[in-house]
Amino acid sequence: TRRLHQMQETPPPVDRGVLMLYNTGALKDPNTYNSILHIADVKPYLRKTEYLIPLDYAYPVYGWGVKFNNNKFVSIVSSEDSSVADNEYIRYERPTFAEILEVKNLVEANFGKPASGNILYHLDKKQLENYAHNEIDKILAY
């Protein structure tokens, strides 16, 4: 697996890889818009280049809450079991279909189509319910 910041490095000695397009932002920064996926965090790493090994792309289809107390990171929480005390708040994050598609289009324009397919991460029925079937199909298409 590769992260965006590793794309300028020499690839490891493997036959193929997966570019992880999630957890792109600063989770613990209270000013972060969405630490799971945000186009502003992805764009600086996109430079038209050919990577030396075939890559597939993994896109996020999950969400979570990031709890802060007095603007200091406390924990990652699920939306079902999250409560807040005084001076606490939760930043809920989930990439929209439009955000995922925008990143997908930019990644493919810069690094090419995936070698054998796209990957959805985190493949969970409850998380997938946040996206329509045709949206999932468009994310997976290559």
At which residue positions do the language-model features occur?
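Substrate-binding cleft of secreted/luminal carbohydrate-active enzymes
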Residues: 56, 62-64, 69-142
